[in-house]
Amino acid sequence: MREIVHLQTGQCGNQIGAAFWQTISGEHGLDGSGVYNGTSDLQLERMNVYFNEASNNKFVPRAVLVDLEPGTMDAVRAGPFGQLFRPDNFVFGQSGAGNNWAKGHYTEGAELVDQVLDVVRREAEGCDCLQGFQITHSLGGGTGAGMGTLLISKIREEFPDRMMATYSVVPSPKVSDTVVEPYNATLSIHQLVENSDETFCIDNEALYDICMRTLKLNNPSYGDLNHLVSAVMSGVTTCLRFPGQLNSDLRKLAVNMVPFPRLHFFMVGFAPLTSRGAHSFRAVTVPELTQQMFDPKNMMAASDFRNGRYLTCSAYFRGKVSMKEVEDQMRNVQNKNSSYFVEWIPNNVQTALCSIPPRGLKMSSTFVGNSTSIQELFKRVGDQFTAMFRRKAFLHWYTGEGMDEMEFTEAESNMNDLVSEYQQYQEASVSEGEEEYDEEAPLEAEE
């Protein structure tokens, strides 16, 4: 079967990862110690994508947990699903990276990386037919960003033909955890552009907004945010974990979603999002799901797709949904909003169906979009980076670990290139001869 090996690095990565395993264990009928209590054969059929069956009917996640300090690991171990993971798969250092990308990528992280790769190799050897890797991390810190990208490039070297998907928490515009976030993020994106096949961008602020605006939570905790992320991760991987009519795997997703190799940064969304109290008062319909899914307020990254155009997007519907209704709704969305889709990729919306809904819902949908408006996010980080780098603020922390200023300049220009590539495809039209301007685009849609 097509297995996926999961890595989680750094504090953020481990917390999101833990939430993800909790969600999918529930969907597959596993309790906190990995014993199967489910009712449906469908839960077992493709269990081995993410789980390894050990002796005495215990299922063990194919997960590698990495951090440069023991704190977060202990928290995961003490959590409700701490007994699920294989004890040898916890790899941690003692020093911490202190939010310093260079420590994670070049010094502390580099010392630990071989240990991690041994565990990854062992997990990969336990697979019949390894499909690829997924990694959860944040781009603003030291371990997840620095060491996470180091792991990605090492795994790339060793498994060049396997898919690499990353769930990356990008720095948010207003909520900043650390001052050097723009440095860490720019250096990380520099790596991801080259080494990842698909990157799902998630951002804390957008998650906060969803919690406050849609879920009506007054002061959302990180637990609530991680719960949202795990819902999306569960949705994106649905087709791999359950038999569906329209199946999709990491490679198919990439083939359908990435028109140009560098442009593989996706926005994700999830529907239905309703406040906890309102669940029982409304039935969810396919049109509602579709509408909510394409709503900018539902996107988990702070960029508004109305400022750009979709190159491609894909929607995963779960539950008892009629194929025809889904097709009609998706066509409807494309016709009504044709100005938001590039016209030089004719069938750029792809749908996949799976008959098993998430726990507690009749149906749900997950949205993955490759929109040129994601450049807002990179622009924002780039501007902050430039402001600090021009004054060489905080640079000594990085050069002290052996980094060169040249690397910063390279990362900066790579990110600027990425932004202008997105912009170029946003403005491109079918007939390249006549320049088409954005001001005219909305009018065409209304005629």
UniProtKB/Swiss-Prot annotation:
The keyword Metal-binding applies. The gene is TUB1. Its cofactor is Mg(2+). GO terms for biological process: microtubule-based process. Residues 424-447 are annotated as: Disordered. One of its GO terms (cellular component) is cytoplasm. It is found in: Cytoplasm, Cytoskeleton. Gene3D superfamilies: Helix hairpin bin, Tubulin/FtsZ, C-terminal domain, Tubulin/FtsZ, GTPase domain. Tubulin is the major constituent of microtubules, a cylinder consisting of laterally associated linear protofilaments composed of alpha- and beta-tubulin heterodimers. Microtubules grow by the addition of GTP-tubulin dimers to the microtubule end, where a stabilizing cap forms. Below the cap, tubulin dimers are in GDP-bound state, owing to GTPase activity of alpha-tubulin. Belongs to the tubulin family. Residues 432-447 have a biased composition (Acidic residues). Mg(2+) binds at residue 69. This is Tubulin beta chain. It holds the Pfam family Tubulin. Coiled coil: none annotated. GO terms for molecular function: GTP binding; GTPase activity; metal ion binding; structural constituent of cytoskeleton. Dimer of alpha and beta chains. A typical microtubule is a hollow water-filled tube with an outer diameter of 25 nm and an inner diameter of 15 nM. Alpha-beta heterodimers associate head-to-tail to form protofilaments running lengthwise along the microtubule wall with the beta-tubulin subunit facing the microtubule plus end conferring a structural polarity. Microtubules usually have 13 protofilaments but different protofilament numbers can be found in some organisms and specialized cells. GTP binds at residues 11, 69, 138, 142-144, 204, 226. Its main location: cytoplasm. Keywords: Cytoplasm, Cytoskeleton, GTP-binding, Magnesium, Metal-binding, Microtubule, Nucleotide-binding. InterPro entries: Beta-tubulin_BS, Beta_tubulin, Tub_FtsZ_C, Tubulin, Tubulin/FtsZ-like_C, Tubulin/FtsZ_2-layer-sand-dom, Tubulin/FtsZ_GTPase_sf, Tubulin_C.
